[in-house]
A protein has these predicted regions:
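Cofactor-/ligand-binding subdomain signature composed of acidic, glycine-rich
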Residues: 1-43, 47
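Gly-rich Lys/Arg/Thr-decorated short loops/hinges at beta-loop-alpha junctions or inter-strand turns
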Residues: 32-40, 100-111, 223, 264
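Active-site pocket-shaping loop/turn-to-helix segments
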Residues: 42, 49, 111-112, 200, ...
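A short, well-structured juxtamembrane/interface segment
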Residues: 46-61
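Aromatic/hydrophobic pocket-lining residues that form π-stacking "cages" and hydrophobic walls in ligand
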Residues: 57, 153, 211
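Glycine-rich phosphate-binding loops that contact phosphosugars or nucleotide phosphates
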Residues: 69-206, 215-217
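Short, amphipathic alpha-helical interaction segments embedded in low-complexity terminal/linker regions
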Residues: 210, 215-300
């Protein structure tokens, strides 16, 4: 599989600002890291047009019953696993809706699996196991843009007719070949040469945040800026759900708590009850008639 020569990979260049890094005192190291990190959000901002295209593709896919599948290796894969894992509790979606594949499997989440990222064959095997379909979106994440596991996944996904997206720090890398949408965030060389868990990793986390969050907002899993579909799986989250309901409805805590009980702790249903002055059965009927569109059910 072709690779990008190291002299052309920005992620492998030496950073002139950190040339004497090992001689710096602690605070100087931290200030340098902080200065470099400030560049990341700006660089991500330059990619908003591409990120927006990816979000719209994800929204369209999920509306058709498709899935968002992240693919990465090492730090990139771990960030993918993290983002996918947070979607069910935050937005109330099925764990199948947003998934992540990491080279080396579950063991690679907490430790290095030697050679896993070099296996192109395993990427195809892993996507076959997911029963990849045309309605799915596959997002390959690789700072270098040359990771065989990720490149193979994108090539296979494109052949299957799925939408393909690349997140990289090297625009001219091979990862762009099979990606219909390329999100190339140029964060410049790392302060520790080649350590892409730093700025490149931070940029990946920001982009993943944007992809999943904006998609879920567009899909109606947020009301105003409130997590209306939050999973109420522990006491902290049950209290948060109560606060969300009081803020969204304007009702006092006692009234909101009663509505939650009446609705079977369904936040959407409870909100329709309180804002429209109806009982749980009527609220449920309005949501069904609106096909789950909360604002439509509320008449807003």
């Amino acid at each position: 599989m072709p690779s990008l020569p190291q002299e052309r990979r920005r992620t492998e260049h030496r950073n002139p600002a950190s040339g004497r890094l090992d001689r710096l005192p602690t605070k100087a190291i931290l200030r340098l890291m902080n200065r470099e990190d400030r560049k990341v959000a700006f660089s991500v901002g330059q990619q908003i047009p591409s990120i927006a295209r990816a979000v719209d593709a994800i929204v369209s896919s999920i509306r058709k019953g498709g899935r968002l599948i992240y693919v990465g290796a090492g730090s990139s894969g771990r960030l993918a696993v993290l983002d996918a894992a947070e979607c069910p509790p935050t937005f109330g979606v099925s764990p199948n809706t947003v998934q992540a594949l990491i080279a080396g499997g579950r063991k690679a989440v907490t430790g290095a699996v030697e050679g896993a990222e070099d296996s192109a064959r395993n990427a195809v095997r892993d996507l076959r196991a997911k029963r990849l379909a045309r309605n799915d979106v596959v997002v390959g994440i690789a700072a270098s843009g040359t990771t065989p596991y990720v490149l193979s996944a994108l090539a296979f996904a494109r052949k299957r007719g799925a939408t393909t997206v690349a997140i990289t720090s090297n625009r001219k890398a091979p990862i762009a070949r099979d990606a219909q949408i390329v999100i190339a965030v140029d964060v410049g060389p790392e302060i520790v040469t080649g350590s892409t868990r730093l700025k490149a990793g931070t940029s990946q986390k920001l982009v993943l945040n944007m992809l999943s969050t904006a998609a879920m907002v567009r899909l109606g899993h947020v009301y105003d800026n409130l997590m209306i579909d939050i999973a109420q799986t522990n006491e902290k989250l049950r209290q948060r759900a109560l606060r969300i309901l009081t803020e969204a409805s304007g009702a006092d805590a006692s009234t909101a708590k009663h509505a939650l009980r009446q609705s079977g702790h369904d936040l959407r249903e409870a909100l329709v009850m309180l804002k429209n002055g109806v009982d749980a059965k009527a609220a449920r009927a309005r949501l069904i008639a609106a096909k789950g569109n909360l604002r439509q059910a509320l008449g807003e």
